[in-house]
Design a protein with these regions (language model features):
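A structural signal for short hydrophobic beta-strand segments in well-ordered beta-sheet cores
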Residues: 15-16
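A short core secondary-structure module
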Residues: 25-74
Length: 178
């Protein structure tokens, strides 16, 4: 969410009960594939309580939101440096009304549901980063073979070779982490 970053307590999208509906207000940013999706899983604050130490805590719940729901819209796509095949957009909720039966799981347990889901996606993000690193290494090798300085390709210089060896070692090490 804007201004929340990774702070779960920074959640600002709220869901309030209204008869047989939930009404969502707020926004989400950097949502992967938002430009293509027709159905979204949205985490919103449903309850404000005190934790065991008496501190205010927000309890979140998960909801199914459809692109055609009234009060829901998708913002413009982000202009990203990479991973352009994935449309990353903002989601906007302005009195977005969804039926009560579209809550996923248990009220107040949406954050746990989101974390369990995100854990499964982390390997995909790591794989994308590794692919980008491998591509950058390939492009760099091609460039240093082509670029001339002092009458020869810069690939012939020992310092360039040291740097390429370091890049290659880091990419290979990353493969074992993924």
């Amino acid at each position: 969410e804007p201004g929340a970053g990774t702070d779960a307590q920074g959640q600002q999208t709220i869901a309030k009960e209204d008869g047989d509906y939930w009404v969502l207000n707020g926004s989400k940013i950097f949502i992967t594939n938002a430009g293509f999706a027709d159905v979204f899983i949205v985490i919103a604050v449903t309850d404000n309580v005190l934790d065991k130490r008496g501190r205010p805590t927000k309890l979140c719940s998960a909801f199914i939101v459809e692109r055609t729901d009234p009060g829901f819209s998708v913002g413009k796509a982000e202009d990203k440096m990479g991973i352009r095949g994935s449309s990353t957009c903002e989601l906007i909720f302005e009195d977005c009304r969804i039926p009560k039966d579209r809550m996923l799981g248990v009220r107040g347990k949406g954050f746990q549901l989101a974390m369990a889901t995100l854990d499964g996606g982390r390997i995909g993000i790591a794989s994308q980063a590794l692919g980008i690193a491998e591509g950058a290494l390939e492009e760099t090798i091609a460039y240093v073979k082509e670029r001339k300085q002092f009458g020869r390709a810069i690939a012939a210089f020992q310092n360039t070779q040291f740097e390429l060896a370091e890049m290659k070692a880091r990419v290979e090490a990353a493969k074992y982490l993924v």
